[in-house]
Amino acid sequence: MTTKGHIYVIDDDAAMRDSLNFLLDSAGFGVTLFDDAQAFLDALPGLSFGCVVSDVRMPGLDGIELLKRMKAQQSPFPILIMTGHGDVPLAVEAMKLGAVDFLEKPFEDDRLTAMIESAIRQAEPAAKSEAVAQDIAARVASLSPRERQVMEGLIAGLSNKLIAREYDISPRTIEVYRANVMTKMQANSLSELVRLAMRAGMLND
């Protein structure tokens, strides 16, 4: 069954976690529960994109520290912070650190689901763009030093002969390297290779 998105709930209060799990699951979201922020951060590298709903006051790593660490990692996950009644200063600090919004407990179910849908809608394009950029960077990293040199020559507009002369190797060998570059970069044409190089930051200067 297709869900409306995945939600990562972080709260040390078991009753609150269970309540949110029921609410969000009923609303059509996929849900993963964490009882503390450190457990979420430990799992983060392997998690698919989703929205984080976290309590602000928790033992150990609190919601503010979680935001600081997520910001330092440049995580694309949108974060909604839940605060207690009257915790406005903490909520403001959370917003300054990158939280997309905050909710004062107790809150209306519809308000939370609307906020989550909005947060996912706004953050998804950036998350997808970041994933694509990481994929392209991984392709570049898979190139051997010589393949990287050949790619740099190609995107600079040099012919096979000129690249061969530059590195004192035969044009035939350059053709082999060129084919390897196109395969590893998953490029079907030189123009596509140039676009990928731009995304990888190889044409910024």
From Swiss-Prot:
PROSITE patterns: HTH_LUXR_1, HTH_LUXR_2, RESPONSE_REGULATORY
Residues the record lists as binding Mg(2+): D11, D12, D55, R57
The keyword Signal is annotated on this UniProt entry: no
4-aspartylphosphate: residues bearing it: D55
Predominant localisation class: cytoplasm
A GO molecular-function annotation: metal ion binding
Entry's localization field: Cytoplasm
GO biological process, one term: regulation of DNA-templated transcription
Keywords, alphabetical: Activator, Cytoplasm, DNA-binding, Magnesium, Metal-binding, Nitrogen fixation, Phosphoprotein, Transcription, Transcription regulation, Two-component regulatory system
Residue spans binding DNA: 160-179
Function recorded in the entry: FixJ, when activated by FixL, induces the expression of both nifA, required for activation of classical nif and fix genes, and fixK, required for FixN activation.
Database matches in PANTHER family: DNA-BINDING TRANSCRIPTIONAL ACTIVATOR DEVR_DOSR
Full protein name: Transcriptional regulatory protein FixJ
Gene responsible for this protein: fixJ
